[in-house]
Design a protein with these regions (language model features):
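Active-site hotspot residues in diverse enzymes, especially metal/ion-binding acidic/histidine motifs
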Residues: 1-192
């Protein structure tokens, strides 16, 4: 499931947002400490963000974590819901689990901090709505999922510091998953 973003973003724009995200929490190392930043992000935005670690059975198949918006009294409150097993594995340093959590944090940064939420449509009756888009049916730069995935990649594997690294160096120094590091080398570092 995907939504069309209200603003399209290029890889270079996302890279700048990643630098801003890291700077917001004074992260100067190659390693992005996802679990520490999760706590810092929740503390910094405690009036609109919290996270919840929940039973694995409470999630649909294939969902590891998700950002949920609850609106009460015209006020938005966001919750990063995290599978218990994903949270436990992230605490142990599992790169994939850290990536799942970071991805949801990136959705929050894009939607709440930068205001890049789903594109709003208004029908002839004046009713506003968003459209659920089939995966891969949008140009990447307009996909909210791609934007969050790209931002997560840029935050966890900083391009300028890792562009000349080997797969092993990236995994070791960034604590990202092997799959994420392979994607970076094949699709990001190679094409820049």
């Amino acid at each position: 499931m995907d939504y069309e973003a209200s603003v399209g973003l290029s890889r270079k724009q996302i890279r700048l947002i990643a630098k801003y995200f890291r700077k917001m929490f004074e992260i100067k190392t190659i390693l992005f400490p996802v679990m520490t930043v999760l706590e810092l992000l929740v503390n910094k935005f405690s009036n609109v963000l919290y996270y919840s670690v929940e039973d694995d059975d409470d999630f649909e198949y294939g969902v590891m974590a998700t950002l949920v918006e609850n609106i009460e009294d015209n006020e938005s409150m966001y919750c990063i819901r995290i599978k218990n097993s994903v949270y436990d594995d992230a605490i142990k340093g599992d790169g994939a689990s850290l990536g799942f959590i970071c991805h949801e944090m990136c959705h929050f940064v894009l939607i709440h901090i930068l205001g890049i939420g789903p594109k709003i449509y208004i029908n002839t009756n004046g009713i506003a709505y968003t459209r659920v888009i089939e995966p891969r049916s949008l140009p990447l730069f307009k996909s909210m999922e791609w934007q969050a995935k790209a931002l997560c990649g840029e935050v966890m594997i900083p391009y300028e510091k890792c562009k000349d690294h080997t797969l092993e160096q990236i995994v070791k120094e960034t604590n990202s998953s092997v799959e994420q590091a392979k994607f970076f080398l094949k699709n990001v570092a190679k094409n820049e």
